[in-house]
C-alpha cells in the first residue's frame, strides 16, 4: 500500500499545487480507513476557497469524526497550528490530521484548548522520492496505527444543555461569518432584502446575519426536540418544528435556499451532525420539569453564543416554580387589598379596568401563567 502510494507521487515538488496529487492521497486514505471500518465516509471538497472548509471530512453514519487538511509538499506543518484556519477547524472538531503528502501530524487540543500535536510520522523525504523506493514495513505499520487512532477518536459525550449550547455556538458563529462573506450571493441578499422590507428597514447586514444564523440553528434544535427519534435533515426540518413556532417554521425554509453555497452547506451539516447525535434525553433531563425546554434552551444557547447580546436583550428565563409563586402572591394581593378585584386575577376577566402589563415579556412566561391562573379560578368557581 505505502510503496504504491509513494510511486504515484514520485514527481512531487514544493512548487506544485497541493491539488496536483490529491487523488493519490485520497486513494491512500480510503485504503487506510478500510483497514478499520468500510462504513467510514471520506468526503473531499477540492473546489473551495482557502480556509473555508477542510479538504477532507470523515464521518460515520452522519456523525463527524474528524478533518484532514492537505498542504503543499515541504510546508512546515507545526507552523500552521496557530493559524486562524487550523484554530477554526479544531474549534469545530478537535480531531485533525495535517499532511503535506509525506508527513502526517495528528492534532487535537490540550486542557487549555490550545493545539496539541498528539503524534506525527514521516513516511519519506522529497530526496527519497527521487530514488528507488523501498519503504520499511514498520513505516507502513506506523502509518496504519496513526490512522487507527485518528479514525477511532471519540468526542467527549454531551450530557447537559450547557455543553450542548457551547458545542453549537462556534458553528453558529461561523455560519454568521459565512453569511457575511457571501452577502453578495443572490441566495443571501434576497433573504436580507426581505428582512429589510417586511421587518426592519434600518437593519444592518451584520445584525441580519447574526439573527439569521441563530434562528437557523435554533430551528434545527426545535425540530430535533420535537422529534427526538427522527433524523432531522433539510427536507423534514420545517414539518418537524412545532406549529406554535410559526415564524421559525417559516424561517426554516431559508435552509434549503442557502444549501447551494458550499461553505454554508458544510456548516449546516456540522450543526445537523451535532443535533442528530446528541443524547436528547440527557438534555431534557438537564432542563428538568421547571423549565420549558423549547424556550429555556435559547437562554442557555445565547449565553454561550454571545453573553453580551443575551444581557443587552434581557434573555433570562425565570424558573416555573418562581413564576407560579409570584403569580399566586399577586392573586392573593388583589383579593385582599383591591376592592375591584375580589376574585383576584379572575376579576380581570370581567373588569376592563384591570390590566396586566409585562414590560419585558421575553418568553411570555408570566403572562401565560397569569391567564392560566385566571382560568383555573373561573373553573373552581
Where are these regions (language model features)?
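Class I SAM-dependent transferase core
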Residues: 300-328
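Charged, often low-complexity linker/regulatory segments
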Residues: 1-45
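Charged, often flexible domain-edge or linker segments that flank or initiate folded functional domains
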Residues: 48-54, 58-267, 316, 322-381
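Hydrophobic (often cysteine-bearing) scaffold residues that line and stabilize catalytic clefts
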Residues: 17, 21, 213-217, 290, ...
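Generic alpha-helical secondary structure signal
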Residues: 1-4, 190, 292-300, 321, ...
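Solvent-exposed, charged/polar functional surfaces in cytosolic regulatory/catalytic domains
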Residues: 31, 35, 194, 198, ...
Amino acid at each position: 500500500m505505502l510503496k504504491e502510494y509513494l510511486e504515484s507521487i514520485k514527481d512531487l515538488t514544493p512548487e506544485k499545487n497541493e491539488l496536483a496529487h490529491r487523488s493519490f492521497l485520497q486513494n491512500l486514505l480510503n485504503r487506510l480507513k478500510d483497514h478499520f471500518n468500510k462504513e467510514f465516509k471520506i468526503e473531499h471538497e477540492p473546489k473551495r476557497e482557502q480556509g473555508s472548509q477542510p479538504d477532507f471530512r470523515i464521518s460515520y453514519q452522519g456523525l463527524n469524526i474528524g478533518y484532514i487538511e492537505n498542504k503543499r509538499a515541504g510546508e512546515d506543518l507545526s507552523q500552521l497550528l496557530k493559524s486562524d484556519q487550523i484554530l477554526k477547524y479544531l474549534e469545530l472538531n478537535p480531531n485533525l490530521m495535517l499532511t503535506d503528502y509525506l508527513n502526517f501530524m495528528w492534532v487535537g487540543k490540550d486542557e487549555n484548548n490550545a493545539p496539541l500535536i498528539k503524534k506525527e510520522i514521516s513516511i519519506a523525504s522529497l530526496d527519497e522520492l527521487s530514488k528507488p523506493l523501498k519503504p520499511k514495513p514498520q513505516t507502513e505499520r506506523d502509518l496504519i496505527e496513526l490512522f487507527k487512532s485518528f479514525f477511532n477518536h471519540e468526542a467527549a459525550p454531551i450530557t447537559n444543555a450547557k455543553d450542548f449550547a457551547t458545542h453549537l455556538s462556534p458553528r453558529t458563529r461561523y455560519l454568521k461569518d459565512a453569511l457575511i462573506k457571501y452577502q453578495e450571493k443572490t441566495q443571501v441578499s434576497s433573504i436580507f432584502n426581505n428582512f429589510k422590507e417586511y421587518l426592519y428597514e434600518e437593519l444592518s447586514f451584520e445584525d441580519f446575519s447574526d439573527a439569521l444564523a441563530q434562528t437557523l440553528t435554533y430551528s434545527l434544535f426545535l425540530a430535533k426536540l420535537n422529534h427526538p427519534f427522527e433524523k432531522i435533515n433539510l427536507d423534514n426540518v420545517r414539518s418537524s418544528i412545532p406549529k406554535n413556532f410559526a415564524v421559525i417554521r417559516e424561517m426554516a425554509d431559508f435552509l434549503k435556499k442557502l444549501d447551494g453555497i458550499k461553505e454554508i452547506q458544510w456548516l449546516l451539516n456540522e450543526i445537523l451532525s451535532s443535533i442528530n447525535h446528541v443524547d436528547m434525553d440527557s438534555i431534557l433531563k438537564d432542563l428538568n420539569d421547571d423549565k420549558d425546554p423549547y424556550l429555556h434552551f435559547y437562554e442557555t444557547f445565547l449565553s454561550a453564543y454571545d453573553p453580551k447580546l443575551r444581557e443587552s436583550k434581557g434573555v433570562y428565563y425565570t424558573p416555573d416554580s418562581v413564576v407560579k409563586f409570584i403569580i399566586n402572591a399577586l392573586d392573593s394581593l388583589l383579593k385582599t387589598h383591591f376592592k375591584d378585584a375580589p376574585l383576584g386575577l379572575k376579576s380581570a376577566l370581567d373588569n376592563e379596568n384591570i390590566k396586566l402589563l409585562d414590560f419585558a415579556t421575553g418568553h411570555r412566561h408570566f403572562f401565560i401563567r397569569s391567564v392560566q391562573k385566571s382560568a383555573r379560578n373561573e373553573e373552581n368557581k
